[in-house]
Amino acid sequence: MSVKGQMLQDPFLNTLRKEHVPVSIYLVNGIKLQGQVDSFDQYVILLKNTVTQMVYKHAISTIVPGRAVSIPHGPTPTSES
């Protein structure tokens, strides 16, 4: 995954995790999973509900927070010319 991809995903997922925001995760096959982000790394998200599920990121289509979240904005990377 590119560095820019991580710069977008990590703050978003970390905010969802720290604020215990309920989420709906839609998989590429159309299945909807619901719960809270318990943990994540480069390849998987641990989704906690009545049980904890390990969801591989490559199987995820969309993550929809149950409420509005504010994502912290870091410094914008500059491209070298």
Swiss-Prot record:
GO CC terms of this entry: cytosol
Any Pfam family the entry gives: Hfq
Gene3D superfamilies, alphabetized: 2.30.30.100
GO molecular function: RNA binding
PROSITE patterns in the cross-refs: SM
Cleaved signal peptide residues: none
Keywords from the named record: RNA-binding, Stress response
GO BP annotations, alphabetical order: regulation of DNA-templated transcription; regulation of RNA stability; regulation of translation, ncRNA-mediated
InterPro entries the UniProt entry points to: Hfq, LSM_dom_sf, Sm
Residues annotated as domain Sm: 10-69
Top-level taxon of origin: Bacteria
Free-text function comment from the UniProt entry: RNA chaperone that binds small regulatory RNA (sRNAs) and mRNAs to facilitate mRNA translational regulation in response to envelope stress, environmental stress and changes in metabolite concentrations. Also binds with high specificity to tRNAs.
Family the UniProt entry places it in: Belongs to the Hfq family.
PANTHER family from the UniProt entry: RNA-BINDING PROTEIN HFQ
The protein's assembly and partners: Homohexamer.
The protein, known as: RNA-binding protein Hfq
Taxonomic source organism: Methylobacillus flagellatus (strain ATCC 51484 / DSM 6875 / VKM B-1610 / KT)
Biological classification of the source: Bacteria, Pseudomonadati, Pseudomonadota, Betaproteobacteria, Nitrosomonadales
Gene for this chain: hfq
